A protein has these predicted regions:
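Short, flexible domain-boundary/linker segments around small modular repeats
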Residues: 2-20, 70-86
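Short acidic alpha-helix initiation/capping motifs at coil-to-helix transition points
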Residues: 4-5, 24-28, 90-94, 105
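Generic structural marker for isolated residues within well-ordered, non-membrane alpha-helices
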Residues: 10, 33, 45, 76, ...
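N-terminal interaction modules that seed assembly of large macromolecular complexes
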Residues: 20-46
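Short, structured motif recognition centered on aromatic/hydrophobic residues
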Residues: 29-36, 48, 95-102, 114
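Extended intrinsically disordered, low-complexity coil regions enriched in Ser, Thr, Gly, Ala
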Residues: 38-71, 106-132
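Short, solvent-exposed interaction modules
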Residues: 58-109
Length: 132
């Protein structure tokens, strides 16, 4: 699998999040990936990082610390706390925009393994349907 290019990643986040500027898309991506990195370990985190642009890979590999795994709702609230002026609603938009691009970069096999490391309910944030 090839590493996604910086501009392609940012353009995809900007389009999905409907951000007016690349700066806003980058801010959302940095925050969401820093929080996501705290929830992943080992091979899956390293493999996912290898598919992201280098700057974002480093953020994923050097995450914000989380005392405990956050369920999806708390993950969104934590994102809102890190983004100036964000509400839970806008943060959910930010999280979904970034994580759906991450899921595309990851591919199905890796995404399945990543979701196994996360508390239940993250599928929708990654733009994936819930398993039956």
């Amino acid at each position: 699998m090839v590493r996604m290019r910086w501009q392609a990643f940012l353009d995809a986040v900007r389009e999905r999040g409907e951000y007016p500027t690349a700066h806003e898309a980058e801010r959302a991506a940095r925050t969401v990936l820093a929080l996501l990195g705290a929830h992943l370990v080992g091979e899956e985190r390293a493999e996912l990082a290898a598919r992201l642009p280098e700057t974002f890979a480093m953020i994923l590999l050097n995450p914000l610390q989380a005392a405990e795994p956050l369920d999806p709702e708390r993950f969104v609230r934590a994102t809102a706390a890190w983004i100036d002026g964000a509400s839970a609603e806008t943060a959910k938009w930010d999280v979904s925009a970034v994580l759906s691009v991450v899921a595309d970069a990851a591919g199905e096999d890796l995404m399945s393994r990543v979701l196994l490391q996360l508390p239940p309910g993250y599928e929708l944030l990654f733009g994936r349907p819930r398993p039956d």
